[in-house]
Regions:
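A contiguous pocket-lining binding segment that forms or flanks enzyme active sites
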Residues: 60-104, 109-112
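C-terminal peripheral helix-coil segments that are non-catalytic and often amphipathic
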Residues: 95-160
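Short amphipathic alpha-helical interaction/hinge segments
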Residues: 9, 13, 39, 90-97, ...
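Short, basic, alpha-helical segments at the C-terminal edge of helix-turn-helix-like DNA-binding modules
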Residues: 2-10
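Amphipathic alpha-helical interaction segments
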Residues: 26, 56, 60, 77-84, ...
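Secondary-structure boundary elements
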Residues: 34-38, 63, 67-71, 155
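Generic alpha-helical structural context detector
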Residues: 3, 33, 80-87, 128, ...
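Hydrophobic alpha-helical connector segments
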Residues: 11-56, 72-75, 79
Length: 160
């Protein structure tokens, strides 16, 4: 039953066309949005044999990198890098939401809770990081890392 449900969710991922980088970026953002709508999927994505939608998704990614001029060995690594970014980010978002520091806590409550175990004088860099989380947009973080990944893959491809 889960296999079919996961495959149905995989079918919601939109696969763009055009230049490889734009297409992969568009697909990754679509997949991220889909997984946010179905937070139960990322932890069990690989627990079940893929169905036709997941196989189609895999084929699309491999073909897009291949058509983008990537050699087979780099296609292999590019696929895993992008998929791990999408899934890893989705799982981390889900776990953060379940940590007790979700949207239902005020910023003051989060600072108070952290202040009890993490004195700012001892952990100044961690506190800077926490404030960036509080003020930032997680969607921007997903895009930032995805762009780094795609830049690196493109550089590897071009270096031959």
């Amino acid at each position: 039953m889960f296999q079919g449900m996961i495959d149905q969710v995989a079918g919601e991922i939109e696969h763009g066309d055009g230049h490889w980088r734009d297409a992969v970026s568009s697909m990754a953002h679509s997949a991220h949005d889909v997984l946010r709508r179905h937070p139960w999927v990322p932890p069990i994505w690989n627990d079940h044999f893929p169905g036709p939608n997941r196989f189609g998704h895999l084929e699309w990614i491999l073909r897009t990198f291949s058509d983008g001029g990537f050699p087979d060995e780099l296609v292999y690594h590019a696929y895993h890098a992008v998929e791990f970014h999408i899934m890893g980010f989705a799982i981390q978002e889900q776990q953060y939401a379940q940590s007790g520091m979700g949207d239902d806590m005020s910023e003051a409550e989060i600072y108070e809770m952290l202040g009890k175990t993490l004195p700012e004088a001892e952990y100044p860099h961690l506190w800077t990081h926490v404030r960036q989380h509080m003020d930032g947009d997680e969607r921007d973080e997903f895009a930032f890392v995805l762009d780094l990944l795609l830049d690196g893959l493109e550089n590897l491809r071009d270096a031959g």
